[in-house]
Design a protein with these regions (language model features):
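Short, structured active-site "lid" loops
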Residues: 1-5, 9
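C-terminal binding/interaction regions
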Residues: 35-148
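Short hydrophobic alpha-helical runs that function as membrane-insertion/retention elements
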Residues: 5, 24-28, 45-47
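Short Gly/Pro-enriched loop/turn and capping motifs at secondary-structure junctions
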Residues: 10-12, 53-54
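Residues at structural and domain junctions
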Residues: 2-3, 23, 52
Length: 148
């Protein structure tokens, strides 16, 4: 899975996503950021600024960001001769994050349920989540939370 998120500056969404286990979110304000993140960090989420700098030509910038984020194989390194060290560093970062993170269900159960209900209450999110989630435990947790 790959998540595209954002907020006014993109910084808040970046910080929020990076608190979750298994998520490596990068900050992307231009296509080069998307390309380098895909090649060097090989993460699974991007945070975009939806207000800051979103003027003329923003739709073109957004299109080019998506092209660079999803075009071709990820994790090839940039420049290519740095691939091995960059991949090794990405694994080290992932292992460090895993060592200090709670499992997702433990994390969700530690968060204020009203905050979660607000965050998960959107109709479009729910449609996407319930139609695509493969984690039965997570689906049941979210259903029960929203039914409270």
């Amino acid at each position: 899975d790959f998540v595209i998120t954002g907020c006014g500056t993109g910084q808040g969404a970046l910080m929020a996503l990076n608190t979750f286990p298994g998520v490596t979110c990068g900050y992307c304000i231009e296509p080069t950021d998307a390309y380098l993140f895909a090649q060097v960090n090989n993460g699974n989420a991007l945070s975009l600024p939806f207000a800051k700098g979103f003027g003329w030509g923003a739709e073109l910038n957004m299109r080019y960001i998506f092209e660079k984020a999803f075009d071709g194989e990820k994790g090839l390194g940039y420049p290519a001769e740095r691939r091995e060290s960059q991949n090794a560093n990405a694994i080290i970062l992932s292992n460090m994050k895993e060592a200090v993170s709670k499992p997702l269900m433990d994390a969700l159960q530690a968060i204020d349920p009203e905050l979660l209900k607000q965050a998960l209450g959107g109709e479009k999110f729910q449609k996407c989540f319930f139609n695509n989630s493969k984690d039965k435990e997570l689906v049941n947790y979210v259903k029960n939370l929203l039914d409270r």
